[in-house]
Curated annotation (Swiss-Prot):
This is Eukaryotic translation initiation factor 3 subunit K. It is found in: Cytoplasm. Keywords: Cytoplasm, Initiation factor, Protein biosynthesis. Its main location: cytoplasm. Belongs to the eIF-3 subunit K family.
Length: 267
């Protein structure tokens, strides 16, 4: 059974107390949540519910917003794809930061001159690539600009966490995958690094028996092909209701078309 959205096994007791009380709306707790985000970046955990509470406080108190903390929250959300975490966080940010064109002229001007807005929109691009399984394009985009490196620098093990999430999705979909393809999807620059990752992290098999190296994924409930036959019993009485309903409608149409007939039609 999955963990409910508002729960986090690694959440400290003081954070849990704030989230379950009125203090979650107290601006003075902003610094507590900010420190908690920094902790998540260091210990590779993710507490979506607490991070959303912080972004909500920023929404009510814009003067308290810390751009670096916001981008760290979004980067952490990337490490738990596929999930609604990134979209939920993005929805709580100011309108001019959103990855679509603003209608207000002042908002457009702010968007064009803000490094913060550029950072948000770059992270939104990464999220789109991950959620649409464009993994090779994700890595090439991530490596294309030094700003991306700066954005993910505070999140310990970012690349490793993303690789693990990609591997999880591959394991749900494939029984076999060419090593060359998986290399690109995981952005592992050598065959040795790939073989080490799939063996130690994924416990998958590397098959070199053929002309091309293939990674074999063990059967699981997601990637196993299953034939499923469903049968339904349809009683005669069910057909009777359908026939009576159709007959009734047919009579209504005939009455409308031939209102002056004296003899009934027989069927």
């Amino acid at each position: 059974m999955g963990v409910t959205f508002d729960k986090c096994e690694t959440r400290p007791a003081n954070i849990d107390a704030i989230l379950n009380g009125l203090d979650r709306y107290n601006p003075e707790t902003t610094t507590v949540f900010q420190d908690y985000v920094a902790q998540q970046c260091e210990d590779r955990t993710f507490d979506c519910y607490a991070n959303l509470a912080l972004l909500k406080l920023y929404q009510f108190n814009p003067h308290l917003l810390q751009a670096e903390t916001v981008t760290n929250v979004l980067v952490k959300a990337l490490t738990v794809f596929p999930s609604p975490a990134f979209s939920l966080c993005l929805a709580l940010l100011p309108a001019h930061t959103q990855p679509f064109q603003a209608s207000d002229a002042e908002a457009q001007a702010a968007a064009q001159t803000s490094d913060f807005v550029e950072s948000i929109q770059k992270l939104a691009r990464l999220s789109t690539l991950l959620e649409s399984a464009q993994y090779t394009q994700f890595w090439s985009t991530l490596n294309s600009d030094d700003l991306y490196a700066d954005l993910v620098a505070d999140v310990a093990g970012f690349e490793e966490l993303v690789r693990i999430r990609i591997a999880v999705e591959v394991g749900k979909t494939f029984r076999e995958i060419p090593a060359e393809v998986l290399e690109q999807w995981l952005d592992l620059r050598s065959r040795e690094a790939l073989e080490k990752f799939v063996a130690e992290v994924c416990s998958w098999e590397v098959d070199k028996s053929g002309a091309n190296t293939v990674i074999k994924v063990p059967t699981n409930k997601e990637n196993e092909a299953r034939s499923e036959v469903k049968s339904e019993r349809v009683g005669v009485d069910m057909f009777g209701r359908v026939i009576r309903r159709g007959s009734s409608r047919l009579h209504e149409r005939i009455d409308k078309r031939y209102p002056h007939r004296t003899q009934p039609f027989s069927f």
